[in-house]
């Protein structure tokens, strides 16, 4: 035991990856975006509604304008790896939130390795990654709920250090 062992409860892990395609209108484009997410994740995406009416964009309240899917486990890590490859393993400092989560967007879904289909077209998408530590469930469970201590919460610095070490990536200060 010459090397100091890390506490396994302090290790960061990916809790979930949320893929979002915001189309801005309901109809055919929304169903095509749904097909893209289904091809990528292998799961059925959920449609999101507009929260309020924006007349300049032609969006009405409760109109379905986006699709998203939540991926967990090894599949989330595999999709994240493909997304980071598109971004060349470089993210900006502002991509990381103060709560330790991070996100980024890509311009074209075909960069992820999905074959181009002329009937679907090309869509960009957002990646949102929620980070956590073992033991975070105590704040969300129904029975015997408790608070997570400040030293155990994920911070921006922790996530950036994990990101650099895990993916051998760069975080730009732009």
From Swiss-Prot:
Assigned keywords, A-Z: Cytoplasm, Nucleus, Ribonucleoprotein, Ribosomal protein, RNA-binding, rRNA-binding
One Gene Ontology term of the molecular function aspect: structural constituent of ribosome
Record localization: Nucleus; Cytoplasm
Domain of life: Eukaryota
Record GO cellular component, one term: nucleus
PROSITE patterns for the chain: RIBOSOMAL_L5
Pfam families recorded: Ribosomal_L5 (PF00281), Ribosomal_L5_C (PF00673)
GO biological process, one term: translation
Broad class of where this protein is predominantly found: nucleus
Database matches in InterPro entries: Ribosomal_uL5 (IPR002132), Ribosomal_uL5_C (IPR031309), Ribosomal_uL5_CS (IPR020929), Ribosomal_uL5_dom_sf (IPR022803), Ribosomal_uL5_N (IPR031310)
Function: Component of the ribosome, a large ribonucleoprotein complex responsible for the synthesis of proteins in the cell. The small ribosomal subunit (SSU) binds messenger RNAs (mRNAs) and translates the encoded message by selecting cognate aminoacyl-transfer RNA (tRNA) molecules. The large subunit (LSU) contains the ribosomal catalytic site termed the peptidyl transferase center (PTC), which catalyzes the formation of peptide bonds, thereby polymerizing the amino acids delivered by tRNAs into a polypeptide chain.
Database matches in PANTHER family: 60S RIBOSOMAL PROTEIN L11-RELATED
Family the UniProt entry places it in: Belongs to the universal ribosomal protein uL5 family.
Subunit structure: Component of the large ribosomal subunit.
Official protein name in the record: Large ribosomal subunit protein uL5
Organism expressing this protein natively: Candida glabrata (strain ATCC 2001 / BCRC 20586 / JCM 3761 / NBRC 0622 / NRRL Y-65 / CBS 138)
């Amino acid at each position: 035991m010459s090397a100091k062992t890390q506490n396994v409860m302090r290790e960061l892990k990916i809790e979930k990856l949320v893929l979002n395609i915001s189309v801005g209108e309901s109809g055919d484009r929304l169903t095509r975006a749904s097909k893209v997410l289904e091809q990528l994740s292998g799961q059925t995406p959920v449609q999101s509604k507009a929260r309020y009416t924006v007349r300049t964009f032609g969006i009405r309240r409760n109109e379905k304008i986006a699709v998203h899917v939540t991926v967990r486990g090894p599949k989330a890590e595999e999709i994240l790896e493909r997304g980071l490859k598109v971004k060349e393993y470089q993210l900006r400092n502002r991509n990381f939130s103060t709560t330790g989560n991070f996100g980024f967007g890509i311009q074209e879904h075909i960069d992820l390795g999905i074959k181009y289909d002329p009937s679907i077209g090309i869509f960009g998408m957002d990646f949102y990654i929620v980070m956590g530590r073992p033991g975070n469930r105590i704040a969300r469970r129904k029975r015997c709920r408790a608070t997570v201590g400040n030293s155990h919460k994920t911070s921006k610095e922790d996530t950036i250090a994990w990101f650099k070490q895990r993916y051998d990536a760069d975080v730009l200060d732009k």
